Amino acid sequence: MSDQLEASIKNILEQKTLKWIFVGGKGGVGKTTCSCSLAAQLSKVRERVLLISTDPAHNISDAFSQKFTKTPTLVEGFKNLFAMEIDSNPNGEGVEMGNIEEMLQNAAQNEGGSGGFSMGKDFLQSFAGGLPGIDEAMSFGEMIKLIDSLDFDVVVFDTAPTGHTLRLLQFPTLLEKVFTKILSLQGMFGPMMNQFGGMFGMGGGSMNEMIEKMTTTLESVKKMNAQFKDPNCTTFVCVCIAEFLSLYETERLIQELSKQGIDTHNIIVNQLLFPDTDANGTVSCRKCASRQAIQSKYLTDIDELYEDFHVVKLPLLEAEVRGGPAILQFSERMVDPEANKN
């Protein structure tokens, strides 16, 4: 259609206010190659770029043929692109927001009553043992605070498959609710503030010190939460392939991001086949022709479903994209749609 948005990531490169960019989708669609390529392009227009892998598989080391750790490391061949790998889900278990909200509601209902202290103990015990994802949420919060202090212009997240990523993006909201409620009930929890502080990795100290630390942390979390839900600061790039399951999961991802108030207006359709033809326009490889026909069907669906998105269509290449020069070359395809016709 004539008013179709440009099939490139130029809109992201031109939006200088962006601070956090998440790249995600179903497993096996090429998220890492796309996130590395996006970071490479951003390094051309921004002063300091950080690429973070939150995927337990940590494929960015393989993509750049360079070992990365938990410390930001300069990517070979670049002057301003750094990369790091973190384990954002050590236990493989997620936070149940419904359980959190139920406990907070119960604690509020019992505030000031005869069962207040008992409920406080139950609340603490539930956090200590019943929600294995709370330490993960705290680690993520501390990581964001640390990254924010390192003065990078923009941060690109190479995320794990969809379900894990959606939990990751819930953490700021989760932490804000938890700390707001704990501080509002500090009269009831006063005798146990040291235990709360230890549980949230804040060390020992007096009740006033614990309250001060929690208040400071809450302010940081509120800032993080506001930024994640601000389209001027944060966006999510969905990566998929032109197949039913991948398209289905992409739609689910976009719906969930919308519910969480997180902006997304870019989709990358990866691994597309453009088979060679003879002088008569016939494709010599029957399997290639069949696969192309399937992909063409889902590309039509994507164009109809996401007409208000920038949809980048990338080809399946003959060789792997590995190493800085190869990633930089591949990244040009995300900027120039004409390059994907070759």
Curated annotation (Swiss-Prot):
GO terms for molecular function: ATP binding; ATP hydrolysis activity; metal ion binding. InterPro entries: Anion-transp_ATPase-like_dom, ATPase_ArsA/GET3, ATPase_ArsA/GET3_euk, P-loop_NTPase. Pfam families: ArsA_ATPase (PF02374). Its EC number is 3.6.-.-. It is an enzyme of class 3 (hydrolase). It is found in: Cytoplasm; Endoplasmic reticulum. One of its GO terms (cellular component) is neuronal cell body. PANTHER family: ARSENICAL PUMP-DRIVING ATPASE ARSENITE-TRANSLOCATING ATPASE, ATPASE GET3. This is ATPase asna-1. It comes from Caenorhabditis elegans. The lineage of its organism: Eukaryota, Metazoa, Ecdysozoa, Nematoda, Chromadorea. The gene is asna-1.
